[in-house]
Amino acid sequence: MSEAIKLFQYNTLGALMAGLYGGTLTVGELLEHGDLGLGTLDSIDGELIVLDGKAYQAKGSEGKVEVVEVSPDEKVPYAAVVPHQAEVIFRQRYEMTDKELEDRIESYYDGVNLFRSIKIKGHFKHMHVRMIPKSNADIKFADVATRQPEYEVDDISGTIVGIWTPEMFHGVSVAGYHLHFISDDLTFGGHVMDFVIENGIIEVGPVDQLDQRFPVQDRQYLFAKFNVDEMRKDITKAE
């Protein structure tokens, strides 16, 4: 019997929406649980991209994108990683928008109530990303998101990594696709807003189990009061 593929998620997007931005898990510990994934860094300082077992930070700095490899000692308030194992692999040979490609990916799903890991390596006619800016906990995530820098670039090669989440888990994560991008030359990346792919290889991986961890030593998290309805609306708006 093969070993179960576990999606490891630390904390929830709902906690971020409530302003719990302090990092409480190291990147080194995170990478023990998977080689592909995403999240954010301490104080929501940019976008975390995990590709091939390495962690990168993409953020907007003085009007331009900055991508750096993250130290194992850096901490995250929220992240999700998985030991990605492609179950479906197909080649995209012609131009498609993000929505068209997402529909094609979903045509391979054998149900709608399981998580999936997503990896799209290719050449993109257009890529549009944003980065959440570093912030203090007294500003709601949805409000921070209204001033996040966005960047667009044409004719770029790179990899999209992400997680597809079933609707019933909205709040724990964001329902549907949550995707981050990093260029092959490590000069561009961020949270994917939209894109046009020219060609590439798409991989869809199964997830058998959800390993949901919580910041059990963080008193701010332990005693936080969450408005669930508002939290879900904020996730939809911000993500």
Curated annotation (Swiss-Prot):
The keyword Lyase applies. GO terms for molecular function: acetolactate decarboxylase activity. Pathway: Polyol metabolism; (R,R)-butane-2,3-diol biosynthesis; (R,R)-butane-2,3-diol from pyruvate: step 2/3. NCBIfam families: acetolac_decarb. Pfam families: AAL_decarboxy (PF03306). The lineage of its organism: Bacteria, Bacillati, Bacillota, Bacilli, Lactobacillales. Disruption phenotype: Slower growth in media containing valine, leucine plus isoleucine, or leucine plus valine. InterPro entries: Acetolactate_a_deCO2ase (IPR005128). Converts acetolactate into acetoin. Regulates leucine and valine biosynthesis by diverting the flux of alpha-acetolactate towards acetoin when the branched-chain amino acids are present in high concentration. Its EC number is 4.1.1.5. Keywords: Acetoin biosynthesis, Decarboxylase, Lyase. It is an enzyme of class 4 (lyase). Belongs to the alpha-acetolactate decarboxylase family. The enzyme is active only in the presence of branched-chain amino acids. Valine results in much higher activation than leucine or isoleucine. This is Alpha-acetolactate decarboxylase. It catalyses: (2S)-2-acetolactate + H(+) = (R)-acetoin + CO2. One of its GO terms (biological process) is acetoin biosynthetic process.
